[in-house]
Amino acid sequence: MKFSRLAGSLISGWLLLSVVAGCGSSDTKTGSATETTAPATTSAPQTAATSTKKTILFYGNSLTAGYGVEPTQAFPALVGKKIDSVGLGYTVVNAGLSGETTAGGKSRIGWVLRKPVDVFVLELGGNDGLRGLPLSATRQNLQAIIDTVRAKSPQAQIVLAGMQIPPNMGTAYTKEFRELYKQLADKNKLVLIPFLLENVGGIPKLNQPDGIHPNVTGHRIVANTVWQVIQPIL
């Protein structure tokens, strides 16, 4: 795998508050976007458009960005290795930014999708939930991102990563947050990952010392969760 930087970073973390958690942050953001080719042949971002390889783009917050681990240890890169292992020709692009909200994701999606993609993995909303933002806005922002992907890459398979949050905002809010992912997936006929952090969220040994971010082992489990869902569509 060979990685290259595509964008600058946004700094802030996401809060893992209980067994089911999302990702939150402050308003100051840092993060990075990286690209890897499966199998690796170049580090130039332009290659995805000029080669015959297909492109899978991971679009999310600190979970996708791999906060606190090396780019090669984050789950998108690990999924790329799995793609290599079965001989599929994909360029894997990590467009995760730590601290990202759905509003932020909506604002930058046009820039990110300057080139067409074949598979788009959408992982956003955790920061919205942990901040208690109106879920009507979260839903609208996610729908806008989906609509933009469909407009710019009509052939793309869209995968939506479900998230859950602790009950701090109340039972009704927590339930509505959890269910909006399936509702959006059903409405738009998306491929759904029911819960991205399945078997990782809230488990100390699978998270970094801050108890917030998945560690290397945690990212391996997340990669397996993602791979089980996306392998059939590649």
Predicted feature locations:
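N-terminal secretory targeting modules
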Residues: 1-59, 67-70, 84-88, 114-115, ...
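Short beta->alpha junction loops
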Residues: 93-101
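Short Gly/aromatic-enriched secondary-structure transition segments
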Residues: 73-74
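Alpha-helical cap/lid subdomain in secreted, periplasmic
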Residues: 106-234
